[in-house]
Amino acid sequence: MIRLFVGLGNPGPEYEATRHNAGFWWTDALARRWNCQLQPDRSYHGLMARCTQRGTPVWLLQPMTYMNLSGKSVAALARFFKIEPAEILVVHDELDLLPGQMKLKQGGSAAGHNGLKDIQAQLGNPEFWRLRLGIGHPGVKAEVAAYVLRKPPSAEREAIEACIDRSLDAVDRMLGADMPAAMMQMHAKPPRPKPPRPVTAPGAPVPPTEPSA
């Protein structure tokens, strides 16, 4: 069962809408769905909400330490409430997935993500869960640092938001400790939108919906 949901990002209005803050967008969306309010908590170096789901307390956390020091916040809360690494989900932006794509996995390397590196170091254990939200790649490694700190175009932001909505539909499975089912649900391809119906000009004959006899 996931007891701690962590969204990664950078604090401050100048970063709020940037790609690197996709994890914050996710925890904000979950807080709205659960009608919980994230509040500053100095003890955990971030914004925290305690919510009750299935009769059990669970926590939402947004570290306010800047991305590279996220582990300080996560480890402080996890140790105080005796939350094991396998009961933690960390949501973060992912360059190697396109906007609208996501991947859920447990453990593994930080793959160059500084927030994950610090969490892994502070917990002393890599076996926490990660939800990777695709933001796309600029195509040139030298441009990555600037790319993640820019706002995505509206179409990309909409794709990321739609991906977040789909992932939230699987949270109940995480609360029920059914991570394989949550993974299958998140990794399923989203349904294709139906093509728009043809627009008929005024006065034009309406095409038949069925072949005439």
UniProtKB/Swiss-Prot annotation:
Q: Which InterPro entries match?
A: Pept_tRNA_hydro, Pept_tRNA_hydro_CS, Pept_tRNA_hydro_sf
Q: What PROSITE patterns does the record point to? A: PEPT_TRNA_HYDROL_2
Which residues carry the site feature described as Stabilizes the basic form of H active site to accept a proton?
93
EC numbers listed for it are: 3.1.1.29
The GO annotation for biological process reads: protein quality control for misfolded or incompletely synthesized proteins; rescue of stalled ribosome
Where in the cell? Cytoplasm
Q: Give the span(s) annotated as Disordered.
A: 186-213
**Record Pfam families:** Pept_tRNA_hydro
Catalysed reaction equations from the record: an N-acyl-L-alpha-aminoacyl-tRNA + H2O = an N-acyl-L-amino acid + a tRNA + H(+)
| This protein's record includes keyword tRNA-binding | yes
The site annotation (Discriminates between blocked and unblocked aminoacyl-tRNA) covers 10
A GO CC annotation recorded here is: cytoplasm
Q: Which CDD domains match?
A: PTH
Molecular-function GO terms, alphabetical: peptidyl-tRNA hydrolase activity; tRNA binding
Q: Where does tRNA bind?
A: 15, 66, 68, 114
**Superkingdom of the organism of origin:** Bacteria
Answer whether the UniProt record assigns the keyword Hydrolase to this protein: yes
> Which keywords fit this entry according to its UniProt record?
Cytoplasm, Hydrolase, RNA-binding, tRNA-binding
Q: What does this protein do?
A: Hydrolyzes ribosome-free peptidyl-tRNAs (with 1 or more amino acids incorporated), which drop off the ribosome during protein synthesis, or as a result of ribosome stalling.
Q: Tell me, how does this one assemble?
A: Monomer.
Family that this chain belongs to: Belongs to the PTH family.
Q: Under what name is this protein listed?
A: Peptidyl-tRNA hydrolase
Naturally occurring in which organism (per UniProt): Leptothrix cholodnii (strain ATCC 51168 / LMG 8142 / SP-6)
- Coding gene? pth
